[in-house]
A protein has these predicted regions:
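Acyl-donor (CoA/ACP) binding surface of acyl/acetyltransferases
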Residues: 5, 13-22, 26-63, 67-74, ...
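Short amphipathic alpha-helical segments enriched in hydrophobics
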Residues: 68-72, 79, 103
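Conserved GNAT-fold acetyl-CoA-binding loop/helix
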Residues: 74-97
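A short helix-loop-beta-strand connector motif used in the catalytic cores of GNAT acetyltransferases and
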Residues: 84, 97-111
Length: 224
């Protein structure tokens, strides 16, 4: 299940590469440092002001389920799969365990955003491709915490961590074109708009375009 990015305003997702039949599946094994290695010593990212990004933990499953339920109307606008998958504490536990399994193989890393002890959002890096030193990022935040710059803060810190710790070269990001808030986050963080995928997502019987962004480790990015 790809939690992309939530909030009534902020939802961004990421998909696997289409060339799976032509190329080997992405793996982090060619990176100088792999996700499994990093996670053995991973410490929460302190964002300041009492906000932290922490690796996914099964103990946080009830809080994750509550967050998705409370924001289901907003999530459903752009990423209905999240609402359909995380429906209660039990399904949230399954999700967290699957995320941990995939993290142990280096395929992705999901972090949860906390305001003190309150889980208020999520940031995920997936499709980690060590051969090409690339990955995709997605994120969401609850409506109670939107409008405060927290998505920009959290995703920005996560991106910098991924570039420096994993030595990635490229991070991609996709969001529904109608989600102007998510696109604004991408622009603020120095992502370049690469193109538009027409009618690529069917949500509630309506086709939507996706915007495709990327940022390179060599890009010059000013303050957010």
């Amino acid at each position: 299940v790809p939690p992309h990015q939530l909030s009534v305003a902020v939802v961004s997702g990421c998909r696997s590469a289409v060339g799976a039949l032509r190329h080997p599946p992405p793996t982090c094994e060619h990176l100088p440092v792999t996700l499994p290695d990093l996670l053995t010593t991973f410490a929460p990212l302190d964002l300041g002001g009492g906000f932290t990004l922490r690796a996914v933990d099964v103990a946080d499953a009830p809080a994750l389920a509550a967050l998705v339920r409370a924001n289901s109307a907003h999530l459903g606008r752009f990423i209905p799969a999240v609402v359909a998958t995380i429906v209660d504490d039990e399904s949230a536990v399954r999700h967290c365990r699957e995320m941990q399994r995939l993290q142990s193989t280096g395929e992705l890393l999901e972090m949860h955003l906390f305001d003190g002890d309150v889980l208020c959002g999520s940031v995920r890096m997936r499709d980690v491709d060590g051969r090409n030193r690339s990955a995709y990022i997605g994120y969401f935040i609850g409506t109670d915490h939107q409008g405060r710059g927290l998505v920009t803060l959290a995703v920005g810190a996560f991106v910098e961590w991924a570039f420096s710790s994993l030595q990635l070269h490229r991070i991609g990001l996709r969001c529904v074109a109608a989600n102007t808030a998510s696109a604004a986050v991408a622009h603020r963080l120095g992502f370049t708009l690469e193109g538009r995928l027409r009618d690529c997502e069917l949500i509630d019987g309506v086709f939507h375009d996706d915007l495709v962004f990327s940022r390179l480790s060599s890009d010059r990015v000013g303050p957010h």
